[in-house]
């Protein structure tokens, strides 16, 4: 299988992040690395998707420039193979053990799944409405089935905003794709006050 592992970043990648990517078990797959710099996150992610389509990749693994992935991230994200699978990362600046994963039952994206909730799950995966892309494996066909842009920021009249990763999740669901989160892929985050095991 041919996989593009790409980091979208405006400036650079943190050393610890690169080390975690370097140490990741490639599971015998052909894995190419790209760091797309100099763009906001939405534009960088769109460029990465286009590289995957143009390069004939089967999957794209996006890892944020401040996210520490576990060594078995790729192995678990591919077990079993799915269209969109997210790793789990702490939500920014919170002590409530929240993640940027919104439950499938929440219509307005106002709720977040917590690590305590995820710790109580019996299976390895859970379907979510939307989730952050700090660590995300996407089958390239998903991008091919979507309209461009795949990632975008949306601002609404009440001044609320839809982030680029949530936008992707909504658009992918409109194309009948499910968004899954893998409870085995617990990522660290250099910019978060709290990290959970």
Where are the predicted features?
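Active-site nucleotide-sugar/metal-binding loop of Leloir-type enzymes
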Residues: 46-59
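Conserved catalytic core of nucleotide-sugar-dependent glycosyltransferases
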Residues: 49, 70-154
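N-proximal low-complexity "stem/linker" segments adjacent to membrane-targeting elements
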Residues: 1-43
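Short beta-strand-to-loop acidic/aromatic patch adjacent to the donor-nucleotide binding site
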Residues: 56-68
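C-terminal catalytic/acceptor-binding lobe
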Residues: 1, 141, 145-197
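Residue-level recognition of beta-strand->loop/alpha-helix junctions
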Residues: 35-37, 88, 183
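Glycine-rich phosphate-binding loop at the start of an alpha helix
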Residues: 42, 46, 71, 166
